[in-house]
Amino acid sequence: MKVKSLKRSSKKEIASLFDRWNKSLKSGDPDQVVKNYAKNSILLATLSNKPRLTVAEKKSYFKSFLINKPVGKINYRKIEVGYDTAFDAGIYTFTFARTGAVVKARYTFTYRFDGIKWFITSHHSSRMPEDK
């Protein structure tokens, strides 16, 4: 029986996963964004009251979200790494190129390594209450 070796990541590698996700937003293609999420992941999005569980639900959310051409920037973060898992939580700001709107939000990404690639297992984002 072969024993799976566990991957211990670095904070730098986990930080790069936000960059990968943000780059997929810039593509404007919901399919590219959704490829970052694990099959059984949950998206609790900033601009939606509905938990997004399926690929179709996530794709639907990002289809409307991407219309305004969002670009995210990390303002503050805390990253913790384990074996095959990690989380990145903090505050980010989205600037929407189409409208000029700026939205500051709290976020949490949890990740799992599947032996080949890191995937988002949960993503929570909520607008900062003081900025409403």
Residue ranges and their predicted role:
Residues 2-10:
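A detector for short, charged/polar N-terminal pre-domain segments
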Residues 11-12, 17, 30-82, 99:
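A solvent-exposed, acidic/Ser-Thr-rich amphipathic alpha-helical stretch
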Residues 21, 25-29:
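Short helix-adjacent coil turns
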Residues 42-46, 85-96, 110:
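Short, well-ordered beta-strand segments in beta-rich or mixed alpha/beta enzyme
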Residues 58, 62, 74-80, 92-94, ...:
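Hydrophobic/aromatic beta-strand elements that line small-molecule binding cavities or substrate pockets
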Residues 70, 84-86, 103-105:
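Residue-level preference for beta-strand/loop junctions
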Residues 79-86, 99, 112-117:
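A short, structured loop/turn motif at beta-sheet edges
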Residues 104-132:
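Short beta-strand edge/turn micro-motifs at domain boundaries
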